[in-house]
Every structure is written in structure tokens, then in C-alpha cells.
Amino acid sequence: MYKRLKILPIVILLVSCKRTDTFPYYPVFLEFNITAIAPELKASGGYKEFTAPLNYSQRVGLGGILVFHSIEDKFFAFDMACPNEQRANIKLHCNNMGIAVCDSCGSQFLVSDGLGFVLKGQAKIPLQKYNVYYSAYLDNLVVRN
């Protein structure tokens, strides 16, 4: 009887303690004209890192916003904070291959496919993805969550 009473609290602790692997919510709203603000996004494979809002009404998430132009002529946007680190001062950096790399933990993420999955490293969850709306007529891009 006493042995069961000793085991019960341990079992309860093991079952109730559950780590959540989610990215914290931060507001995101970024709107800009590609020709004026980010001409590097005109070409497929181009990317732009926004680490600060362009004006007072815009928000760039936790670590900033990475916008990538895929070879399928689609735009994808991700938070630049590494999901493993989840700190604003540790940012991912993209390369022309469509891979974002965290300098702190070494995790690598594939952004060119629009999913942000982990390629290698310590990270367990993909990048935080944001919705992208593109107006070809106005050449404007809107990123929001």
C-alpha cells in the first residue's frame, strides 16, 4: 500500500509535465512595394530580411520577417527568430539556396518550398510561417498572421 502511494506522485508528475513545442505569438503586419523597397525580390530565389518595421503601424514578429521568392513565382514569409532559441536577438540568415541558418544553434531550415521544415540541427519545430498576399498590378506585398 505504501509503495503504491510513493509511486503515485511520480506517475502524476511524469504524465502532467508536458513540454509544448510551439512558437510564441507576435503580431505581424508588413506592407511594401517590391520595386521601391525590396527589388531583390523581383527575381526567383531572391530574399529580403526585414528586421524593423517600415513605419509605426507595422509589426515584424519576434525576430523580424524573412520574405523569399520561390522558383514557382510564389512569395513565402517566415519569422527570423530561430524556433529552437525563441529570442529576438538570435536571428536566422538566409542564403541563395533557400536555406535559413541559425548562427547560435546551427539549425538549418528549408524556406524555398514555403514550409520552413528543419533540415538539420537542434530545432524540433519548423519556422513560424506567415500569410503573404501579392498584388501583381500594384507590385505590393502584404505579410500578416
What are these regions (language model features)?
Residues 18-95, 110-113, 128-145:
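N-terminal pre-ligand scaffold of iron-sulfur
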Residues 1-17:
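Sec-dependent bacterial lipoprotein signal peptides
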Residues 96-106, 116-130:
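Short cysteine/histidine-rich metal-coordination sites, predominantly Zn2+-binding motifs
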